[in-house]
A protein has these predicted regions:
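Glycine-rich phosphate-binding loops of nucleotide-dependent enzymes
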Residues: 2-237
Length: 237
């Protein structure tokens, strides 16, 4: 059986010398797939994503990307390997224009990135319209599109999003999810942490429900939405 494109396998660890937050947690994503991590507050969702990105030290387990063990690489080196990461907050330069923000995303590129910029504008048409506007003047949903677009400028092999719909209205959330689906259709696998579990699972090829840093449930998005225990405990019935 072929290994998933990305796998954080049996990850155990926490921040610095503190207690473990993750306990044998496994997260995997295939090419072109949307995988979401959901669960209650304090479940370790964002911690699991940060572990995959190298922002905390694992005591046990490993992270492999496209068959390579990247467990000992820094976040910067993981970006060079093909990881794109969009944090939940402070993810744009508010005083720069939209286009300047996107061009900042190409900082590791040594080639002509104009074609990639056009692809980002095709995925996020509102950014083309507002490309000369200061990013700080945009709405919350538009700022998130800038942040995702900037990550795409690195031509990542994998895109990770930490609560991309935090603080936006339901209508904007639906639009962001539509854009995320469009990104996945280009072949880029997406790993996403979401508080809006029901909506996230509805677009997910694969879902992971974490509880206290452990895998509680996993399966396709549809399977988890139809699981009575998941619905009762995490989706409000």
């Amino acid at each position: 059986m072929n290994e998933p494109f990305l796998i954080g396998e049996t990850m155990t660890g926490g921040y610095g010398p503190g207690p473990d937050i993750l306990h044998s947690c496994t997260i995997a994503v295939e090419r072109g797939e949307i995988a979401v991590i959901v669960g209650p507050n304090g479940a370790g969702k964002s911690t699991a994503m940060k572990a995959v990105f190298g922002m905390l030290r694992l005591r046990e387990g490993q992270v492999r990307l496209d068959g390579d063990d990247i467990s000992h690489l820094s976040p910067q080196d993981r970006v060079a390997k093909g990881m794109g990461f969009v944090p939940q907050t402070n993810n744009i330069f508010t005083s720069m224009t939209v286009q300047e923000n996107l061009e900042m995303g190409a900082f590791i590129r040594r080639d002509d990135f104009r074609e990639t910029l056009e692809q980002v504008y095709d995925l996020f048409p509102i950014l083309r319209d507002k490309r000369r506007q200061a990013a700080g003047e945009l709405s919350g949903g538009q700022r998130q599109q800038v942040a995702v677009g900037r990550a795409l400028m690195t031509k990542p092999k994998l895109l990770m999003l930490d609560e991309p719909t935090a603080g936006v209205s339901p209508i904007v959330m639906d639009e962001l999810f539509d854009r995320i689906i469009e990104v996945a259709r280009t072949g880029i696998p997406i790993l996403m942490v979401e508080q809006n579990a029901r909506q996230a699972l509805s677009i997910a090829d694969k879902g992971y429900v974490l509880v206290q840093g452990r895998n509680a449930f996993s399966g396709s998005g549809a399977e988890l939405l139809n699981n009575p225990e998941v619905r009762k405990s995490f989706l409000g019935g």
